[in-house]
Curated annotation (Swiss-Prot):
Family under the similarity heading: Belongs to the bacterial ribosomal protein bL32 family.
Sorted UniProt keywords: Ribonucleoprotein, Ribosomal protein
Domain of life: Bacteria
Identification of the protein by name: Large ribosomal subunit protein bL32
Gene label: rpmF
Biological process according to GO: translation
MF terms in GO: structural constituent of ribosome
Length: 64
């Protein structure tokens, strides 16, 4: 199994880790429904799936 030849200092380790950061999710508000959702994602609202302000799927319950 491989082992490091030299000890990595805390400073060097931390400099490498500066690129790993948490990002805030970008949230949009639909102009039609007023629902908050993630950008570039479809979302459900009152039994309908919306994407870019248009109804993609209208979920109708079948009556037997």
């Amino acid at each position: 199994m491989a082992h490091p030849k030299r000890k990595i200092s805390k400073t060097r380790r931390d400099k490498r880790r500066t690129h790993y950061k948490a990002t805030v999710a970008q949230i949009a508000t639909c102009p039609i429904t007023g629902e908050a959702h993630l950008y570039h994602r479809a979302y459900w609202h009152e039994g309908k799936m919306y994407y870019r302000g248009q109804v993609v799927i209208d979920k109708q319950t079948a009556v037997a």
